[in-house]
Amino acid sequence: MFRRLLIATLIGILAALAVAAFRHAMQLLEWIFLSNDTGSLVNAAEGLSPWRRLITPALGGLAAGLLLWGWQKMNQQRPHAPTDYMEALQTDGQFDVGASLVKSLASLLVVVSGSAIGREGAMILLAALAASSFARRFTPREEWKLWIASGAAAGMAGAYHAPLAGSLFIAEILFGTLMLASLGPVVVSAVVALLTTHVLNGSDSLLYTVHLTVDLHAREYVMIVSTGLVAGLCGPLLMWLMTASHNSFLRLKLSPPWQLALGGLIVGLLSLLTPTVWGNGYSVVQSFLLSPPLFSLIGGIFVCKILAVLASSGSGAPGGVFTPTLFVGLSIGMFLGRIWGFWLPGSDEIAILLGLAGMATLLAATTHAPIMSTLMICEMTGEYQLLPGLLIACVVASVLSRTLRHDSIYRQHAAEH
């Protein structure tokens, strides 16, 4: 047992370093190519001339597509090995190291150039890859899946400052590939990754800053659960739209470089309307939580952003769908909050409350992981008083979504990419 705890600690540190390396690479490329040192792609887009804002995502997609296409052509005769941690956990626990690194580099290119795709996909992949490389050298083969799972959970903890949610991400989404009795090392790796991330960042701040002062009574619980019902309907719709977008790109029969470039060009065109479509949506979520926008502004940004997400994901841009899903959920929740605000006092407080509820419930509706989704929002914001209401709403959203569509967004995304 002591040996496993020691290995879990080392994997947590390795995962945090992998996440930090990807984050610093992003910041370096943003500074070199976009003259941006704020860490916000939205700020970078606002500082660019219209024509640069238009073509930058397309150029990033083209570069990433060429990289992926070139690697595929060079390695056509090689036997296939997983380049995704979920696939590795479901097979023999081995990665194609070269292909995984190329996929992560391609993800870095599309993320830095403004595509509306999440960076957490590459971060978790690199963390799991680091764990796999360590495990293959120093642990017996029968433990490899455990350490890949620990690396993936630690990667999520480092990316989202949410170690418990990262651990439950493994337990809920990958249920059946890892026994619950093995979660001890997974939790240790996730917590160590978070602590290492805090040391590297020089602070232990929450991922999102929220000022929520509303008292929770029966009325608030009704609003939270009703948000879960709406999210349970919207989750399958979002996944259907992603599938439809992906199939539309496939029907064009473009080579990967041109397909990703087209997805980037669509993002660039949308960014001429609003630069908030750039990136994974993190900075927009934070600004909305600090100052909820008006009804019409939420709707306008929401439509543009979801079109950008569909273009990026549908074109095959390598990356995650986690943070974009959080943005969509926030927008749905705040939209409902503004509707409730027509009749109830404290419109901004209601918008923030239901925005957080929307983030949790849409995440639950798309991942079919209600406990993880609830803890994720609480850990990212520190608003643990919402836990009982969010848990009920997330279960409602997950059950309704699973009834309407069996696949989760991660199973769908893995199948398409």
UniProtKB/Swiss-Prot annotation:
It comes from the Bacteria. Belongs to the chloride channel (TC 2.A.49) family. ClcB subfamily. Residues 26-53, 167-172, 243-257, 309-315, 372-379 are periplasmic. CDD domains: Voltage_gated_ClC. This is Voltage-gated ClC-type chloride channel ClcB. Pfam families: Voltage_CLC. GO terms for molecular function: voltage-gated chloride channel activity. InterPro entries: Cl-channel_core (IPR014743), Cl-channel_volt-gated_ClcB (IPR023790), ClC (IPR001807), ClC-type_chloride_channel (IPR050368). The lineage of its organism: Bacteria, Pseudomonadati, Pseudomonadota, Gammaproteobacteria, Enterobacterales. Keywords: Cell inner membrane, Cell membrane, Chloride, Chloride channel, Ion channel, Ion transport, Membrane, Transmembrane, Transmembrane helix, Transport, Voltage-gated channel. Probably acts as an electrical shunt for an outwardly-directed proton pump that is linked to amino acid decarboxylation, as part of the extreme acid resistance (XAR) response. It is found in: Cell inner membrane. Residues 1-4, 75-145, 196-221, 279-287, 337-348, 401-417 are cytoplasmic. Coiled coil: none annotated.
